[in-house]
């Protein structure tokens, strides 16, 4: 009996965590993507922290959120290109976004669900990614706007309106 899945594709692959923190360079050798493909997998998820591609600075201010480190973005580009080269679907996932972090105890200066400044910064970053990757088809690249938005019960992390991801969805399409 042949099984054909309806709807969304069923991906099999790996999380590559090197861009989830600012403590490492976030670089993955192309050979990693080649090996993932040769082993029969077809998916790589990149859990990202926006702090990886911003220049840092005072977390009590929104200004550093808009200061982009182009070299860090180029390392994300390299992952997307390697995915294309080896037939891997790449998923870009914001684990940490302006005003939101899934990790307990991680300080964010604003609340994505309550502060308009955080919503604007969140949308600005997704617009940056949407423009950067606009020519790559959704069969090769997808976006997960915010990781597990309702997973934590903390009022600082829990969405009450769902408005923020909805505001960014048009950019990511």
Q: Which residues does each predicted region cover?
A:
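Short, well-ordered coil/turn segments that N-cap beta-strands
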Residues: 7-12, 40-42, 84-90, 135-141, ...
């Amino acid at each position: 009996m042949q099984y054909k899945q309806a709807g969304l594709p069923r991906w099999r692959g790996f999380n590559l965590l090197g861009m989830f923190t600012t403590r490492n360079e976030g670089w993955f050798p192309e050979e990693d993507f080649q090996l993932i493909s040769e082993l029969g997998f077809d998916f790589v998820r990149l859990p990202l922290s926006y702090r990886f591609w911003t220049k840092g600075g005072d977390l009590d201010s929104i200004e550093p959120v808009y200061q982009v480190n182009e070299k860090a973005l180029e390392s994300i580009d390299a992952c997307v290109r390697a995915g294309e080269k080896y037939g891997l679907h790449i998923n870009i996932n914001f684990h940490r976004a302006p005003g939101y972090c899934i990790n307990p105890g991680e300080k964010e200066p604003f609340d994505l669900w309550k502060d308009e400044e955080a919503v604007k910064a969140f949308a600005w970053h997704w617009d940056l990614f949407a423009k950067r990757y606009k020519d790559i088809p959704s069969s090769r690249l997808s976006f997960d706007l915010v990781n597990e938005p309702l997973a934590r019960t903390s009022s600082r992390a829990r969405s009450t309106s769902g408005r923020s991801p909805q505001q960014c969805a048009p950019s990511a399409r």
